[in-house]
Regions:
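Periplasmic alpha-helical coiled-coil/stalk elements that build and connect Gram-negative outer-membrane
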Residues: 7-124, 238, 242, 284
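Small/polar, glycine/serine/threonine/aspartate-rich low-complexity segments that form flexible
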Residues: 103-114, 147, 160-195
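Amphipathic alpha-helical coiled-coil scaffold segments and their short linker/junction regions
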Residues: 92-162
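Amphipathic alpha-helical coiled-coil segments
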Residues: 4, 8-27, 81, 134-149, ...
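Transmembrane beta-barrel architecture of outer-membrane proteins
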Residues: 14, 59, 156, 186-188
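Membrane-embedded beta-strand positions in outer-membrane beta-barrel channels/transporters
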Residues: 16, 122, 158, 190-192, ...
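Outer-membrane beta-barrel pore domains and translocons
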Residues: 63, 152, 162-166, 194-196, ...
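Outer-membrane beta-barrel proteins
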Residues: 54, 168-172, 202
Length: 314
């Protein structure tokens, strides 16, 4: 049950941060719309004073309209993701509306724990991992089954006891030699023993099967432990890689923003071409896409480590 709960919580966390990711994407689109609006104004002014061309102005307006359309699609997508999150939190049968609202707000940041170490994940892993807990429980059940089967080969001793009491009251003496009132009481006890001789072969066969099952469950446990250690190492390597990628993209976004600011100003002064400005804007758009993806991927890697550890449920 805990394994299912942990997996469900991991799915809910990842779905929630998909929404946060798309909200960050929406903010990036809105920022790019402001830059495109500035380009529209500049290209229109350049056209009016004879320094620009109408195709430049038209292309700027087309790019702005494309961003407006992208914003509308992004808002719709976020509402769809909220409905998916509601369904995972509160599953609703087909044909029924989910009672949870979809007009709630989510955070616009993705918090990431940068201090997770491999030793911290490995510490007490065999006790906290839900998958290993299941394997260990199956091994314990197999051991109890063996004890139960072995008990069938031993003699069974039973203690029996009884207390009898009877009272007879005759109003009329049918026989003069019998008393009118007769009372009997007594305590009886005894022992009985059963020796399973004829069932020996069947019991021996069941014991062998139970011993084989213990060996099989032990193999499964060791296999799951080895596989879990491998998954933890791979997940941690991914976590470290995503942290490095995030640091790189956080540095790169600053360069892209500075590049757009400088290019807009030089375009205003007539020292930069229209194509160079569009390339700078495209570089900023790509930088935002990579940064937002890096943040989300780092969070997914962190969640996976905690899922394997069993740290999502206390």
């Amino acid at each position: 049950v805990k394994n299912q709960v942990v997996n469900t919580i991991a799915e809910v966390i990842n779905t929630y941060y998909i929404i946060v990711r798309q909200k960050q994407q929406l903010k990036a689109i809105e920022e790019q719309m402001q830059i495109n609006q500035t380009r529209v104004d500049l290209s229109k002014r350049r056209l009016e004073i004879g320094m620009g061309s109408r195709p430049e102005y038209l292309q700027s307006q087309i790019d702005l309209n494309a961003q407006v359309s992208a914003k509308l699609h992004q808002e719709t997508y976020i509402r769809e993701l909220k409905a998916i999150l509601n369904q995972r939190i509160n599953p609703t049968p087909a044909g029924q509306d989910n009672p949870l609202p979809i007009d709630y707000e989510v955070s616009d940041t993705i918090p990431i724990d940068f201090e997770i170490t491999l030793d911290a994940i490995r510490n007490n892993l065999e006790e906290s991992s839900p998958s290993l807990q299941i394997s260990r429980k199956n091994l314990e059940i197999a051991g109890l089954s063996l004890k139960e089967v072995k008990a069938d080969q031993y003699p069974v001793v039973q203690f029996n006891s009884a207390y009898n009491f009877s009272l007879t009251n005759n109003d009329v003496a049918l026989n003069p030699f019998l008393p009118l009132i007769n009372q009997n009481s007594g305590f009886n006890y005894g022992f009985s023993a059963a020796i399973p001789i004829l069932n020996y072969r069947n019991t021996h066969r069941l014991i062998k099967q139970a011993e084989l099952n213990i060996g099989y469950q032990n193999i499964l446990y060791n296999s799951e432990r080895s596989a879990l250690n491998l998954r933890v190492v791979n997940a941690y390597n991914t976590y470290e890689l995503q942290k490095e990628a995030l640091a790189l993209e956080e540095s790169n976004i600053l360069l892209a923003k500075e590049n757009v600011t400088i290019t807009l100003e030089t375009y205003r002064l007539g020292s930069t071409t229209f194509i160079q400005l569009r390339e700078a804007e495209k570089s900023l758009e790509d930088a935002y896409d990579r940064l937002i993806a890096a943040r989300y991927n780092a969070k997914v890697a962190e969640t996976e480590l905690l899922r394997l550890k069993g740290g999502l449920v206390k």
